[in-house]
Regions:
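Activity-critical C-terminal alpha-helical subdomain
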Residues: 68-133
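Short, surface-exposed loop/strand segments
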Residues: 1-61
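Extended, charge-rich low-complexity interaction segments
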Residues: 54-76
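Extended hydrophobic secondary-structure segments that form protein cores and membrane-embedded regions
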Residues: 6, 33-36, 64-68, 117-121
Length: 133
């Protein structure tokens, strides 16, 4: 499986490589250098360009996007209801960016679209690093 990463920093990308491989429990090829943004707002801004690049110019299977929640609204089960969107929830916003960007992508190289996985670390990704301690 070929996976691309989009995160807020190089340190986050390094940790994500280990985390994604452990979660998926399968051999992974990471697509090029990770795609990085500087902070939360930039992740949402560059994500459409990253998705277009991955879909049309690579054979990536998935894009993993991780941002910190910081003080934003935390995603809850209520947010998963059909048609529901919370404008201050980072998970809702990133899912919407993916949906709006990829909805008109044609099938290419035998795949419908690049899959996505979005993680919002609460309160920050450093908390994930401490999991299990």
């Amino acid at each position: 499986m070929k996976v691309a990463l989009l995160s807020e920093s190089p340190a986050d990308e390094a940790a994500l490589r280990v985390l994604v491989a452990a979660v998926l429990r399968r051999p992974l090829d990471f697509v090029g250098p990770g795609y990085r943004a500087r902070g939360w707002p930039n992740v949402a801004q560059v994500m459409p360009a990253v998705l277009r690049h991955l879909h049309f110019n690579t054979d990536a299977d998935a894009l993993v996007v991780v941002v910190d929640a910081d003080d934003s609204v935390v995603h809850t089960a209520e947010h998963d209801r059909p048609g529901y969107f919370h404008p201050h929830c980072r998970m809702c916003r990133l899912r919407a960016v993916h949906r709006q960007t990829t909805r008109r992508f044609p099938a290419i190289n035998g795949r419908e679209r690049v899959l996505r996985s979005v993680g919002v670390a609460v309160p920050a990704i450093e908390a994930w690093y401490l999991c299990g301690r």
